[in-house]
C-alpha cells in the first residue's frame, strides 16, 4: 500500500471512529468528501471509472434494461456508465458534497442525482427499479445500521428486477486492514436477501490487491 493511500485510510479511520463515538456513525462520509476539496485521490474508493465487474455483468445480461438505481453512488462513474448503456438512472449518496461533485464532473448528465439516505428513501422509489446496484456500501456500515439498511433494498425492485451487489468477502482469510470496511459473509448476504431468488454468487481477487477476497452477487425479485 502506498504512503498516500495509507494516510487517507488512517484519516478515514479517525473520522469513522469519531462519528461512531458521537452516535452518528455515517457522518464521516460527508466529512471525508468535504475534506477532500475535490481531490479524488483523497477518496480511497474513487476509481474514476465504472466498476469492471458491474460492466462485465451488465454486458452479459442485455435482457436487463429500464430504470436503474445506484446506492451510494460516490463520484458517479457507475451511474454514468449505466446511463450511457441505456438505463434511466437515479443515483444517490448520503453526502451532499459528493453529489455536488458528481454534478460538477458531469454537468450535462442524464443521471438524476440526489442526496438521500438508504434508511429513509423516497416512497416513490419503492417497487420502481429494474436494476439496483450496491457496491461497497453495506460493508462501510457498522453492523447495527447495516442490518436495518439491507432490509430497505429488496422493496426497491420491480417484479422481475435484479439486484447486483459487489464488495469484500469475509472468507477463511482474516482481514489485515482496520475497519471500515467490514467484509461480509456469503451467509449473511444470502440470509438478508432470502426473499429474492439467488441468481449468481462468485468470489474473486484483484491483481493489485491479492490479499482481499471480493464477491459479486446477484438476486432477482
Predicted segments, located by residue:
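A conserved beta-strand element that flanks and buttresses the S-adenosyl-L-methionine
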Residues: 133
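Conserved acidic residues
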Residues: 130
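Short catalytic micro-motifs in class I SAM-dependent methyltransferases
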Residues: 136, 140
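Class I (Rossmann-like) S-adenosyl-L-methionine-dependent methyltransferase catalytic domain
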Residues: 1-125, 141-221
Amino acid at each position: 500500500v502506498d504512503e498516500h493511500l495509507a494516510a487517507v485510510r488512517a484519516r478515514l479511520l479517525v473520522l469513522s471512529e469519531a462519528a461512531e463515538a458521537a452516535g452518528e456513525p455515517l457522518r464521516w462520509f460527508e466529512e471525508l468528501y468535504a475534506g477532500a476539496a475535490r481531490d479524488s485521490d483523497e477518496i480511497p474508493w474513487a476509481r474514476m471509472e465504472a466498476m469492471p465487474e458491474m460492466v462485465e455483468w451488465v454486458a452479459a445480461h442485455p435482457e436487463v434494461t429500464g430504470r436503474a438505481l445506484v446506492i451510494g453512488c460516490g463520484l458517479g462513474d457507475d451511474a454514468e456508465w449505466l446511463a450511457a448503456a441505456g438505463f434511466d438512472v437515479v443515483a444517490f449518496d448520503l453526502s451532499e458534497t459528493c453529489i455536488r461533485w458528481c454534478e460538477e464532473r458531469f454537468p450535462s448528465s442524464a443521471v438524476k442525482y440526489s442526496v438521500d439516505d438508504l434508511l429513509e428513501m423516497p416512497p416513490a422509489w419503492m417497487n420502481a427499479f429494474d436494476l439496483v446496484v450496491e457496491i461497497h456500501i453495506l460493508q462501510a456500515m457498522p453492523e447495527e445500521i447495516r442490518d436495518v439498511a439491507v432490509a430497505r433494498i429488496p422493496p426497491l425492485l420491480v417484479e422481475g428486477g435484479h439486484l447486483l451487489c459487489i464488495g469484500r468477502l469475509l472468507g477463511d482469510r482474516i482481514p489485515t486492514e482496520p475497519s471500515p470496511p467490514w467484509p461480509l459473509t456469503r451467509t449473511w448476504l444470502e440470509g438478508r436477501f432470502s426473499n429474492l431468488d439467488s441468481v449468481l454468487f462468485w468470489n474473486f481477487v484483484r491483481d493489485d490487491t491479492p490479499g482481499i477476497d471480493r464477491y459479486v452477487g446477484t438476486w432477482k425479485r
